[in-house]
Swiss-Prot record:
Major subcellular location class: secreted
The protein's name in its UniProt record: Beta-galactosidase 7
Organism in which the protein naturally occurs: Oryza sativa subsp. japonica (Rice)
InterPro entries for the chain: BetaGal_gal-bd, Galactose-bd-like_sf, GHD, Gly_Hdrlase_35_cat, Glyco_hydro_35_CS, Glycoside_Hdrlase_35, Glycoside_hydrolase_SF, Lectin_gal-bd_dom
Lineage: Eukaryota, Viridiplantae, Streptophyta, Embryophyta, Tracheophyta
Protein keywords: Apoplast, Glycoprotein, Glycosidase, Hydrolase, Secreted, Signal
Record-level GO BP terms: galactose catabolic process; plant-type cell wall modification
Length: 775
């Protein structure tokens, strides 16, 4: 205990010394029990998470500008160790991994940065952000009071902090970084490490503070974060679940306000997109309620929407079963909460009338009304004036010309003597592949004697990988796959025909991402565990200890046949008479669609594999794994325009399960339908106080409003997804809206009776619902 107190005291001394030095420079950031204090002024911050490695440098300026226009003050990002140090001691800060360039772009647009260094990040990211070489460090135990781990963690954190200092990116230096994070959600696994857990927390905090960045440090979901490190909340409803700061001198910060929720029974669970599942986005009203409650109940002063821009898990960086498309949450406008009264109604069904300081108010179900100066309602969470838009994928190029496609059938390894490794045991997969490929071949020879009787046998394989494909004597015999929420092991039990004499069994074990969380992650095992053959009534013959050969990766991967140079290293065939079957590479070319709309591939006709454009992997696909809705978890795959050339773009896919490439289309994405729904008692934005509520709609990408699909001033039924005229309707609704909007990029229509020629139904609360098309 005394040792822990000494460390805490040392932290405070170091932090105080740093604050004194930075204060002399005229720029200082500290905190008190209410908020972060920037150059002497308390600030309330609204932040959005945006990961530089999940987009491209060409996209960053526009994404950041949209975040700023959406009302954000701060962009929050993780730092991904495994992209920056993929090989020990060899660093990469180029292209989409140029962290400094990303932060400078944020600064150029006048926003602040929350830098989550981790270096464990989870983030549904490969190996939780750790480089796999860390797994092979002798005697290492991740995220514990373990000297090998602490040394490597300190080296990387110091590398990042030193880089930020050298570039002058911390706020006291004139930069945008106002806060940093060390570790991430460690409390969830801390008990697994016993006494080592708290010691590690104290060490991590001391190490971070000792780097003297001049800005506060925080730990997410870490109630025992030592002073001066701030403990923060991650979750859906931090206004209800957060225990609060562990010191009266620390502010309440919400570092992850999740913008999607679980489809299951646990309403407070985070739901990120995984293969085989549907994802449920949160309604803006629900997010607004949660934010207002956090501010009212916990005195919150920092909220970050996770995610504000989701982006793409390029290449193989998605964690286990996580889709290539990382989700986008709906951003909310910023509201200047200089309010002193929050009236909360937790009832989800009733609208009570309340008296507050001689003011009579109705509180909508599950809502919070924010009163400025305890008198004027400036914000109601049940009435979020957010525009809704519907994205449309427009097929602009069909890749259905059979003459433009070529195929290469991936060879199934048959010869043990040509294996990468051999051994009389079943190897663990990630240790063998170093997580540099999803694929590991297990090859064994089985001698079948005539005396064994029936040539039809059963092949039994149990595996801790995610997918298994089995071949016997070069013939495909079956596959099996798991799921994110299912049992860890998968089992293949299938018939096979054996010939007399030697038979070659080739098993392709496939990982769909590596783990990203959990205690003792370095000890997790994957790959095939048991292989057996049963013939007739004979006992199962286990092959676990036979001589096995191993081939790491696919042949096409080794030769990089997805690149312009590598594509010439194999003999491609026409697909005129090709019967689609597992493990086939396909290639073609396509032209870049004109314009600036986002470009995607529609891979609905395919099965499972990976796709490259001009040598750049745009990620794994798995459209054959349907969600409960019956639809693929993801069918459209984003191609950043920065990956493209004007024409002759090389498209290469490796298909594991079959699929028809002739049905693939190149699409552009655009918001073709926009909608606004505001009632006459909605609170206008603070900057418009005193004015009447308005429906505001606008088209993106230079498009203009071409038609009005629906307009009703009265009591329209439904919302932006489903709507019809109600019992009260102004006949002039459509003509008024058309006159205000047609041919324009955007328009605003006051929600007031005079605009529509008078009150169509006195005594009834009215709203205006408008649905418009953009072209």
């Amino acid at each position: 205990m005394r040792g822990g107190m000494a460390i805490t005291a040392a932290l405070v001394v170091v932090a105080a010394a740093a604050e004194s030095r930075w204060a002399e420079l005229g720029r200082e950031i500290t905190y008190d029990g209410r908020a972060l204090v920037v150059s002497g002024a308390r600030r309330m911050f609204f932040s959005g998470d945006m990961h530089y490695a999940r987009s491209t440098p060409e996209m960053w300026p526009k994404l950041i500008a949209k975040a700023k226009n959406g009302g954000l003050d701060v962009i929050q990002t993780y730092v991904f160790w495994n992209v920056h140090e993929p090989i020990q001691g060899q660093y990469n800060f180029e292209g989409r991994y140029d962290l400094v360039k990303f932060i400078r772009e944020i600064q150029a647009q006048g926003l602040y940065v929350s830098l989550r260094i981790g270096p464990f990040v989870e983030a549904e990211w490969k190996y939780g952000g750790f480089p796999f070489w860390l797994h092979d460090v002798p005697s290492i135990t991740f995220r514990s009071d373990n000297e090998p781990f602490k040394q490597h963690m300190q080296n990387f954190v110091t590398k990042i902090v030193t880089m930020m200092k050298h570039e002058g990116l911390y706020y006291p230096q004139g930069g945008p970084i106002i806060i940093s994070q060390i570790e991430n959600e460690y409390q969830m696994i801390e008990p697994a490490f016993g006494a080592s857990g708290p010691r590690y927390v104290r060490w991590a905090a001391a190490m971070a503070v000792g780097l003297q960045t001049g800005v506060p440090w925080m730990m997410c979901k870490q109630n025992d974060a030592p002073d001066p490190v701030i403990n923060t909340c991650n979750g859906l409803i931090c206004g209800e679940t957060f225990v609060g700061p562990n010191s009266p001198n620390k502010p309440a910060l919400w570092t992850e306000n999740w913008t999607s929720r679980s489809n299951g029974q646990n309403n407070s669970a985070f739901s990120y997109p995984i293969y085989g599942n549907d994802t449920k986005l949160r309604a803006p009203e629900d997010i607004a309620f949660a934010v207002a409650l956090f501010i009212a109940r916990k005195k919150g002063s920092f909220v970050s929407y996770y995610m504000y821009h989701g982006g793409t898990n390029f290449g193989r960086f998605a964690a286990s079963y996580v889709t290539t498309s990382y989700y986008d949450g709906a951003p909310l406008d910023e509201y200047d909460f200089k309010c002193v009264a929050f009236l909360v109604n937790f009832d989800q069904h009733n609208t009570p009338k309340v008296e507050f300081r001689n003011i009579s108010l109705e509180l909508a179900p599950k809502s919070i009304s924010v009163l400025s100066d305890c008198r004027n309602v400036v914000f109601e969470t049940a009435k979020v004036n957010a525009q809704h838009g519907s994205r449309t994928a427009n097929a602009v190029q069909s890749l259905n010309d059979i003459n433009n496609w070529k195929a290469f059938i991936e060879p199934v390894p048959q010869d043990l003597s040509k294996s990468t490794y051999t051994g009389n045991q079943l190897f663990e997969q990630l240790t063998t592949t170093k997580d540099e490929t999803d694929y590991l071949w297990y090859i064994v020879s089985y001698k079948n004697r005539a005396s064994d009787g029936n040539q039809i046998a059963h092949l039994y394989v149990k595996s801790l990988a995610h997918i298994l494909h089995a071949f016997v004597n070069n013939e495909y015999v079956g596959s099996v796959h798991g799921s994110h929420d299912g049992p860890r092991n998968i089992v293949l039990n299938t018939h096979m025909s054996l010939k007399e004499g030697d038979n070659t069994i080739s098993l392709l074990s496939v990982m769909v991402g590596s783990p990203d969380s959990g205690a003792y992650m370095e000890r997790r095992t994957f790959g095939i565990q048991t292989v057996g053959i049963q013939q007739g009534q004979q006992p199962m013959h286990l092959l676990n200890n036979d001589l096995w050969g191993y081939q790491v990766g696919l042949f096409g991967e080794k030769d990089s046949i997805y690149t312009q140079e590598g594509t010439n290293s194999v003999r491609w065939m026409d697909i005129n008479n090709l019967i689609y079957h597992p493990l086939t590479w396909y290639k073609t070319t396509f032209s870049t669609p004109p314009g600036n709309d986002a470009v995607t591939l529609n891979l609905t006709s395919m099965g499972k594999g990976e796709v490259w454009v001009n040598g750049e992997s745009i990620g794994r696909y798995w459209v054959s794994f349907k969600a409960p809705s019956g639809q693929p978890s993801q069918s459209l795959y984003h191609i950043p325009r920065g990956f493209l050339t004007p024409k002759d773009n090389l498209l290469v896919l490796v298909e594991e399960m079959g699929g028809d490439p002739l049905q693939i289309t190149v699409n552009t994405m655009s918001v073709t339908t926009v909608c606004g729904n505001v009632d006459e008692f909605s609170v206008p934005p603070l900057q418009s106080r005193g004015k009447v509520p308005k429906v505001r709609i606008w088209c993106q990408g230079g498009n203009r409003i071409s038609s009005i699909e629906f307009a009703s001033y009265g009591n329209p039924v439904g919302d932006c997804r489903s709507f019809r005229i109600g019992s009260c309707h102004a006949e002039s609704s459509e003509s008024v809206v058309k006159q205000s909007c047609i041919g324009r990029r955007g328009c605003s229509i006051p929600v007031m009776a005079a605009k529509f020629g008078g009150d169509p139904c006195p005594g009834i609360q009215k709203s205006l619902l408008v649905v418009a098309d953009c072209r």
